[in-house]
């Protein structure tokens, strides 16, 4: 049960952060921010939801990192990707296949980038401590990492 709760907390926070983030980034999706009440409330809650999502994902990281270490079988799996695409058996991949392991590590990397860039652009708390060029770079990094 704790694994499922952790998973759903992460998933719920992801949806809230993604929906509000789309509303911030694309004016035509501004209506999506209503999921958090008002656009003003979405601006306040978005960073807190992001921090909760990061903390929840870090718990999952420590639970699953050892299952996601890349090994020789994963290289064999990657080299035989054509067989996998046409649904042929390649062999046992263990708990997770190479593709799933890549998604796991990409999620870790991008969540760290989202956290760091999010802290830099978080107004009114941390943004005043950074220069405008650093904030602009952090905004670009945050947008790229969210995709």
Residue spans of the language-model regions?
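Membrane-embedded alpha-helical bundles that constitute the cytochrome b-like, heme-associated redox core
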Residues: 1-147
């Amino acid at each position: 049960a704790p694994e499922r709760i952790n998973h759903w907390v992460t998933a719920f926070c992801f949806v809230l952060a993604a929906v509000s983030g789309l509303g911030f980034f694309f004016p035509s999706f501004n209506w999506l921010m209503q999921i958090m009440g008002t656009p003003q409330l979405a601006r306040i809650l978005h960073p807190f939801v992001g921090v909760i999502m990061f903390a929840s994902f870090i718990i999952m990281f420590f639970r699953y990192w050892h299952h996601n270490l890349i090994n020789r079988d994963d290289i064999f799996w990657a080299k035989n990707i054509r067989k996998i695409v046409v649904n042929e058996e390649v062999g046992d991949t263990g708990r997770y296949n190479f593709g799933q392991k890549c998604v796991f590590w990409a999620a870790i990397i991008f969540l760290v980038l989202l956290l760091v860039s999010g802290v830099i652009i978080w107004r009114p708390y941390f943004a005043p401590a950074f220069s405008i060029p650093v904030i602009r770079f952090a905004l670009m990094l945050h947008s790229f990492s969210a995709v």
